[in-house]
Amino acid sequence: MIECRGVSFSYDGAVPALDGVDLNIEDGEFFCILGGNGSGKSTFAKHLNALLQPDAGTVRINGMDTRDETKTWDVRAACGMVFQNPDDQLVATLVEDDVAFGPENLGVPSAQIAQLVREALKGVGLVGFERHETHALSGGQKQRVALAGVLAMEPRVLILDEASSMLDPRGRKGLMKACRALHARGMTIVMITHFMEEAAEADRVAVFQT
């Protein structure tokens, strides 16, 4: 469960990007945060896996306070994040190597990594792409590889920070299909978007305003 109480944050003491946000997200929920540019929705997303810390208030992930530095990696393991530009997350030449990168750095045994890669690619509809070069993929395929790389680390919560905003309609459709399948399997989804049709897929929607 994600619990946010009175979360406020500003960049360099400027106008607050977040001002007293109170929000709960339940386990297994598909939750969407909708808003325009500058509304603070991406800033809020970065608080959910401790990339940013609140100036005031608290963010708790399964009871863990994100301000507790001893829990930072546990928080990030629980909350996997997919960003706007997949090229910023892809690190390897081949798809299977990219998806394996996270588990390898966590020290997961090789045999288990192979299974995690298979399951992650299956979850995003990219079985058969293992030996494809990442640079040759479409934007939508790249984003699904980035998603698979996060899934291979087995997070409990998936955060998508404007993950579809750089994709064409076909790519967005493929990403949403993967998200629906993951949600059907019980994963908590937090989607940050400005697309109304994506928000319509969610169980609940919070609207952030500038």
Task: For each feature predicted by the language model, list its residue ranges.
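Conserved ABC ATPase "signature" region
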Residues: A111-F129
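Catalytic Walker B motif of ABC-type/P-loop ATPase nucleotide-binding domains
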Residues: L158-D161
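The feature captures the beta-strand-to-loop junction immediately N-terminal to the Walker
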Residues: L34-G36
